[in-house]
Amino acid sequence: MNFPGFAHDTRAGIHVVHGGIGYPVLLLHGFPQTHLTWRHVATSLAEDFSVVCPDLPGYGASAPPPDGHAKRTTAATMVAMMRDLGHDRFGIVGHDRGALVAFRAALDHPDVITHLGVLDVIPTLDNWAALTGTAGVFGFHLYLLAQPSDLPERMIAADPDTFFGHFLDNWAAQPIPSDIRATYLAGARTPEAIHAICEDYRASAFVDADHDQADRDAGRRLTMPVLAMWQDPGEVDLPFDPHQVWARWAPDLSTHVLPCGHFLPEERPEDVAAAIRTLFTR
């Protein structure tokens, strides 16, 4: 069992596992994964925290959202889910797509979100600005998945396991266990899941970027302690400095670079759990 001692629940169509006792922390997964990416970190944190790990709307066992995939909408859904679980204020940590939801929740609900952790991602607005010239090759999926329906859906449906498996295999410095990989693929290959994932990326290309731009124009910044972690790029020359990007949004920022691939919660769970614990001491 990947989450010993955790309860499995469904709240308003959102599949969620939760367990532990202590200050509440919400852990959000990325693409093309599910709550399982947090299995090691969550069980460690449950010694000191009330840990909540949902499948994002449209991912895994969670139903697609009725009101679209804007991160503002998903963030509000997560806040409502946590309130339904009895948590009016909490910390939030996200990886990849989940970090974008966490970022939006922290900007939109600063009275609710007390601590923010973001893993291996930069905000949507900054990401689009960085993907210029040949740098766009590394983020090709951002452009593909954001194309109008149903072009990418049809392309991916021709061989979804190869498509999603490409990211699971090539973004990881250490292989994802075969049973976990199979679960991710099973949750992503259905027509409903493929469409939901594409809608998630379409939102990032348009409405999410607009929301970020409006916040930047208004001078809004993150008011809580923020932890930003990312993989060591090694010999890859990133088209941006993650620390500089996040410092522009977060006055109270700490950063960590880990020697691993993209999937930090799976590849370096002990380091991630330790960093989260430190975040909550600030």
Question: What are these regions, as identified by a protein language model?
Answer:
Residues 2-10, 14-17, 24, 52, ...:
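Flexible "cap/lid" subdomain of the alpha/beta-hydrolase fold that forms the substrate-access gate
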Residues 17-61:
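Conserved HGGG/HGGXW glycine-rich cap/lid loop of the alpha/beta-hydrolase fold
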Residues 38-39, 239-240, 269-270:
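Conserved strand-to-helix beginnings and helix N-cap segments that scaffold or border functional pockets
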Residues 261-269, 273:
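Catalytic histidine-centered segment of alpha/beta-hydrolase-like enzymes
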